[in-house]
Amino acid sequence: MIGLVGRKVGMTRIFNEDGVSIPVTVIEIEANRVTQVKTVETDGYSAIQVTTGSKKASRVTKPEAGHFVKAGVEAGRGLWEFRTTEGEEFTLGQEINVDIFADVKKVDVTGTSKGKGFAGGVKRWNFRTQDATHGNSLSHRVLGSIGQNQTPGRVFKGKKMAGHLGNERVTVQSLEVVRVDAERKLLLVKGAVPGATNGDVIVKPAVKA
């Protein structure tokens, strides 16, 4: 089953029948319009390309405009691709809505995490801070040792150190689907999803469900 592209609206909470508070993220999923259908014969694999939302005409390049016209759809804010399996049939211009998740219990959500800039080891990797006093005057938030001795005589690749944190593709798996509101084009999932408010997210049925 394919996924859908949505927009993170924000977090809130709802109450179940027992009065228990459930923290949920609201994802707005407008109709995903099929802009291209890829097949094994023409492209070497099966997939569909979709767009969603809208884009100012002045912001659409000529190649993009031609691509959208050929598909017979309104220009969207981006293009995304989903692999399809045997038996899944889609046509150019077809609209796919949030109700495809009506019977789905859990989903995987992919987004771009919030960028935090250059961060130290404590914030980036949850390293423990060193002593505040007891003779420590300079190394409160320093990593500590980053190597061994003359052998190997280098710092191993992948060593957890200070550096750029966030602003990368992140997937949160197996989030519970709390509610599907097809009328308002909303999907409510339990817990947090990556990224800032209004960020694009990709929602797919959970691979580990």
UniProtKB/Swiss-Prot annotation:
Report what the Swiss-Prot or TrEMBL entry states about this protein's PTMs: Methylated by PrmB.
Record-listed N5-methylglutamine modification sites: Q150
Protein's recorded name: Large ribosomal subunit protein uL3
Q: Does the keyword Transferase apply?
A: no
Family annotation (SUPFAM superfamilies): Translation proteins
Function text: One of the primary rRNA binding proteins, it binds directly near the 3'-end of the 23S rRNA, where it nucleates assembly of the 50S subunit.
Q: Which family does it belong to?
A: Belongs to the universal ribosomal protein uL3 family.
NCBIfam families the UniProt entry points to: L3_bact
Quote the InterPro entries the UniProt record gives.
Ribosomal_uL3, Ribosomal_uL3_bac/org-type, Ribosomal_uL3_CS, Transl_B-barrel_sf
**Which molecular function term from Gene Ontology is one that the record holds?**
structural constituent of ribosome
Q: Which domain of life is it from?
A: Bacteria
- Per the record, a Pfam family? Ribosomal_L3
Q: How does it assemble?
A: Part of the 50S ribosomal subunit. Forms a cluster with proteins L14 and L19.
What is one cellular component GO term in this UniProt entry? cytosolic large ribosomal subunit
Q: Which GO terms describe its biological process?
A: translation
Q: Which PANTHER family match?
A: 50S RIBOSOMAL PROTEIN L3, LARGE RIBOSOMAL SUBUNIT PROTEIN UL3C
Keyword set, alphabetical order: Methylation, Ribonucleoprotein, Ribosomal protein, RNA-binding, rRNA-binding
